[in-house]
Each structure stands twice: as structure tokens, then as C-alpha cells.
Amino acid sequence: MTASPESMGQKFRNMTANECFQSRSTVLQGQPFGGIPTVLLLNIILWVCVVLVYSFLRKAAWDYGRLALLIHNDSLTSLIYGEQSEKSSPSEVYLEAERRDKGFSTWFFNSLTMRDRDLINKCGEDARIYIMFQYHLIIFVLILCIPSLGIILPVNYIGSALDWSSHFGRTTIVNVSTESQFLWLHSIFAFMYFLTNFAFMGHHCLGFVPKKNLHFTRTLMITYVPTEIQDPETISKHFHEAYPGCVVTRVHFCYDVRNLIDLDDQRRHAMRGRLYYTAKAKKTGKVMIKVHPCSHLCFCKCWTCFKEVDAEQYYSELEEQLTDEFNAELNRVQLKRLDLIFVTFQDARTVKRIHNDYKYINCGRHPMQSSVTTIVKNNHWRVARAPHPKDIIWKHLSIRRFSWWARFIAINTSLFFLFFFLTTPAIIINTIDMYNVTRPIEKLQSPVVTQFFPSVLLWAFTVIMPLLVYFSAFLEAHWTRSNQNLIIMYKCYIFLVFMVVILPSMGLTSLDVFLRWLFDIYYLEHATIRFQCVFLPDNGAFFINYVITSALFGTGMELMRLGSLCTYCTRLFLSRSEPERVHIRKNLAMDFQFGREYAWMLNVFSVVMAYSITCPIIVPFGLLYLCMKHITDRYNMYYSYAPTKLNAQIHMAAVYQAIFAPLLGLFWMLFFSILRVGSLHSITLFSLSSIIISVIIAFSGVFLGKFRIAQQYEQPEEETETVFDVEPSSTTSTPTSLLYVATVLQEPELNLTPASSPARHTYGTMNSQPEEGEEESGLRGFARELDPAQFQEGLELEGQSH
């Protein structure tokens, strides 16, 4: 005699209560209404406290909350001469923002009332795409609140499977009888959620598909070029003979500039110090400073290492030493040529032809030959369209081939074993439970501790662990910032979804259970129990608490950025002079990491979509998170991070991940149908069909999106001349920051900085003292030449002719 679905469901509920949640777990232990009211109240209180503390720190802590504004206002000109009465655009915009940012809490209201146009003018086109993506998610989740709270939640609550004492459980799908026809509503709405989300993402894509002329380049990046070739004419000759009618306008060789870039940064740092104290000495006389990093810790002047020295002389001598080292390294760079070149052509059609000729070289196809084929060895070349010069990380170009792949594989293998086998948050917390660490907490029997503490701990792990992924991407030494952000985004998202959604949902909450689930053959026979963990009432409450914590306490901590604040305060405390403090402020204003922020946001979005049907009360809290995240990101992009510009791959990857997020909800419904109503039930078959159709639609959308973007790179009908494609004779008018040459090699005129100082009394001139107006003019010109492009790492799209 077979058991009924109802009795089978009751049996599984009894089994999984002990199997999914450890007997003394402080994380997944049931509480009245899941502890949600307590967690919500505590998060509101903490969020208010964090905002108040940050309002004080943002200006009290040496302009910590306004670093993005300081990278424009703290130029050498303002450092030496003070703020000027007349500022050219866009500096006027930043000064206006500073004038509006005078009160204790004006920054908060400015973030709410800030116009999108002001944000886009300062932060660039990528900021517009990012906030538009958030707008689409917010509107989508807002629409989801209507069926989730108006239809699914009442249907769940009027069910009869659970007792009336189970307050939170009655709001979940567990309370719906397996014989009820209302289960059709859950399956239908899960499929409708996917279709609606797909439509919203498609509409969002229409707003940032790259225009033809903006993304087309006439420059090719060629690797595996023999390093013995030193004459650009050899490369030009090959292309001219192999492709008749081809005109090469420029050939750029690449060099190993890792050491040169580091020396240049130190040299410019010393240069700022010398210029600052030279100007200050003219006004107030000789300035004495302590140069030891720990001099602020000791107020005694008797220690030799803490003695004061002449600031102007110190920085002049330091600049002279670093300049000599820089010039010596600059002379050696020519001997460190890489097997990588950038070739710019006059005709866009030629670029397409050459690129297609080398596209299938790995399949045995031979490219066109020339009389110098044996010299250039073009059969070994790998040809690709060149990224924008501002997108290239020049110091990483020297790390390639075996060393790059060995580093990449070693780093990611370590991360995989660390994250997926040992350190998911639920595994760590329950492993701690095994050693009685949390027994004092259990004795308190307070939902404040037993519910709020675990949700904060889960949030902390989901922040700290992706930071390891984030920093590991820098160790991988990617060639472009776009690829670096893309890798960060994919790794963080995949890791977070497994760590936060999939493993805890299936009850894999302790290391021994996880290893048994992976490797024990007999344990796998009872794998059905694992999937039942998805549908326990307390499991949904656990994820609601996580979303609440991320929405309030989490966004508050994103404002605070404790790690950056500690680093900032420490570096300022150990600084030796005002120029160093300006340098610290500028360097700490990092680019806004779109990849990391996308991953964190989409992780919470995936949690909401996974439980939007089985636990519909999570949807309004997901809306709260998206709204708070949007406000926080607007503030951070404008005030705390430097502008950045990437290619469309980052934003398209976010769209793909958002499209696949509702599939989790469909899979959850399929598991529920199989386990509760049977694998051959009509609801189960409908859920399976919905998943198949949704997967086909999702992959079709991805392929169509990639195809559409690929079409934009095809040759445009009407070509527009870009700054890269001008004739060599016009290079004098070409901005040096837009050449395919490392920035450190573009300014040879700055290798030596003629300025009188006590350390160097003469630079070979007859005049002992320059005219005051002449020196002031020179310093102003140098300041303008040195600063404008240094702190804007953004990728500017070429050929912007509107």
C-alpha cells in the first residue's frame, strides 16, 4: 500500500527538521515568526547609528567621505597657490557640489535629490547604465510585490497543512496542501516572473547597446611577434605586401614597464613635495619636517631618526635620486621589448579583412604571406581588436604565457577549495557550534542574539569572502580593466550564489554533512532529504533575515567602508607632510568596481527570486534592499569613488545573471512538486516544461545579445576618423593619453624637472634666481600638465563625434 502525498510530506518534514538543522545550531534554529521583527528592528537601529557616525566621520576624518571630489580639487595648482576664484568646467561642478555639502546631514539629502544628469556628468556613461539597471530591477520587484503579497501570500496563509501556532510557516508554500489546486498558481507565477524579468532586461539592453562608430577601432593587437624586430617599417612592409592597398599609419612596440611605472609614481610624489615647499618657503620661510614614518608617534626631539630636516632640501634630494633612477630604468626599457605590438591602419575595411584572415589560424589556416614572412613569422601571430589604451593595464603586459596561466590556475584552485569545501558561512557557523563555542549564546534564549547575530555573521562572510575574490583578481594580472572587472563579477556571483543560496538551502550546513553528501555513496541514497531542506519554513526566514541585514546594516557599512577608513587613517597618521596627505587622498579614491557591486546586488536579487514563490514575504524586503542599494551607490559613485569607464561586457554580464536568477525559483518549484506531489503529477510536468522553455529562452537571449553586440563591431557604412587613426604628421595634435603607448613613456619632457633648490644650486644656467612671475607661470603650467589625466583611469570611447 503506497503512502499518500500528504503523509509522505509529513514524514519528510519530521525527518528534515533534524537532518537539515543541527540540534544546537544558532543559525537555522526555529524562532517565533523566524525572528524577522526583531532582526528588522535591530537593523533599523543599527542603520541609523551607522549613518550618524558616518555623517560625523566623513568630514571630521580628513575629508574621507569626499575623496572623489578631492581628486579634482586637490591639484598641484590648488596645492601650491590655493583655490582659484575662476575654475573651468568640470571643476565648477565639483566646487558647486562642495558648496552644497556643508551641513551635518546634507550629504544624505543630496543623494536623494541628486539629478541623474549630475551623476552621469561626473561619473560617466557606465554610471548611467548601472543606475538604469537598478531602476529596472526596482520596478520589476515592485511589480512582483503585487502578486506575491496580493495573491500568493493569502493563498499560502489560508492553507491547512500547518498549525495556527506556526505563524511564519503559514506564509510559506509548506502550508498549502499537496492536494490543493492552488499549487497551480505558484507554478504559473514562477514562470510569469521569469518572462517579466526577461522582458525588463531586454528593455534595459536597448539603452546601452554600443553604437557602431563609438566601438569601432582601426587598431589591432598582435602577439607572438619576434622581439628581434626593432624597425616599425618591417611590420608596415609586411602588411603592405600581404594586403595590397593597406596603409599602416602607426606601429607601437610594447615594453616591460613595471619598474618604470613604480619609479615614476615615486618621482612625481617627490616632485609634488618639492614644488609645495618651494612655494611655501617663499611665503613663510624655511619649513622643517620629520621624515620618519613613525615620527608622529614620538614627540621627543632627542632621537636622531626623528630629527627635523629642511623640507625643500629633503624633497629636492629625493626627487633628484628618483629622477636618476627613473632615467636609468628608462634607458634600459628599450632592451625589454615584449612580443606584443599595436598596429593602426588607415582603412577600417582593411582592419576587418586582416582580423578575419587571422581568426582561424589555430585551425590550420595560413594567413597572407610577404617577402618578410620569415622575419616577422606571421604564421605564429595572434591578432585581436585592440582595447582602448585607457583600458590597458600596461604593467601587466609583461606577465603572460606560462607564468600567467600558472598564476591564474593556482589562485583559482586555491579559492575553489577554500570557498566551496570549507568556508561557506553556514558551514563555518555550524562547525563552530560543534565545539560548544555558541553554548553561552544558546542559554540566553533571546531572538536578539539567536537570530540577529547569525544574520549579521552571514552578511559579514558574504562581504569578506568576495573581497578575497576581488583582491585575487589583481594578483592574476589581467591585461585590461574590463577583463579584470568581468572576472571579478563572474567569480563573485557564482561563489555567492553557491555560498548563500544553494548550499544552505539544501541543508549543507556543516562540514561533515557536506563531505558525506559529496563522497558517501550510501548517504546519496537519502539525497531526497537534502532537497526537502529548501521547503522548511525556518529556511525562508533565515534568508529573509539575510536580505534585511543586507538592506539596512549592509548598505550602511558600504557607506562606512571600514577597511578603507582604517587604511586611510593609518596612512594619514604616518604621512610626513601635506603633499603626502594630498597624494594619499588622491590614491585612495579608487575606481568604482562595477563587477563587484553587480555581483553583490545580483546575489541578493537571486535570493529574492529563489524564494519569491515559496516564501513570498521576502519580496518587499528585496525591494527595500534594491532601493537602499541604489541610494548608497549613487552617493558612493559621486563622492567616494573615482570615475571609471569600461566596455559593455560588464553590463551585459549583469543582464545575463539577472536573466538566470528567476530560474532558481522555477527549480525550487520543480523540487517541491517532485517531492510533495510526485514526479508524474501534472503540476510537476508543467514545472519541468516551464524550466525547459525558460532555459531555451534565456540561452537564446544570451546568444542573440552576443550576436547583436558582435554586429556592432562590423565595419560601419560610413567611417569616422578617430583620434587613433590620424596620419603620423598630425600626432602633435593627438592627446598623448590616447596613444597605444604606456603613459610613463609618453612624457619624456618630464624626465627632468628644472627647479632650483638647496640641494641643486644650479642646473647649468647663468641666472641664479628666476623671475618670480616666470617661476610662478612655470609651476602653474607644470601643474596643469601633470595632473589632469593622472587620476582618471576611465576608458574613453574613441571616435565620439556627435
Swiss-Prot record:
GO terms for biological process: glomerular filtration; monoatomic cation transport. Residues 61-124, 206-401, 477-480, 574-593, 641-647, 703-802 are cytoplasmic. The chain crosses the membrane at residues 36-60, 125-157, 181-205, 402-431, 447-476, 481-517, 541-573, 594-612, 616-640, 648-676, 682-702. The keyword Signal does not apply. The modification Phosphoserine is found at S75, S78. Residues 1-35, 158-180, 432-446, 518-540, 613-615, 677-681 are extracellular. Expressed in podocytes of kidney glomeruli. Keywords: Calcium, Cell membrane, Endoplasmic reticulum, Ion channel, Ion transport, Membrane, Phosphoprotein, Transmembrane, Transmembrane helix, Transport. InterPro entries: Csc1-like (IPR045122), CSC1/OSCA1-like_7TM (IPR003864), CSC1/OSCA1-like_cyt (IPR027815), Csc1/OSCA1-like_N (IPR032880). Pfam families: PHM7_cyt, RSN1_7TM, RSN1_TM. It is a multi-pass membrane protein. One of its GO terms (molecular function) is calcium-activated cation channel activity. It catalyses: Ca(2+)(in) = Ca(2+)(out). It is found in: Endoplasmic reticulum membrane; Cell membrane. Monomer. Acts as an osmosensitive cation channel preferentially activated upon hypotonic stress. In contrast to TMEM63B, does not show phospholipid scramblase activity. Enriched in mitochondria-ER contact sites where it may regulate the metabolite flux and organelles' morphologies in response to osmotic changes. In particular may regulate mitochondrial motility and function in motor neuron axons. Required for the functional integrity of the kidney glomerular filtration barrier. This is Osmosensitive cation channel TMEM63C. The lineage of its organism: Eukaryota, Metazoa, Chordata, Craniata, Vertebrata.
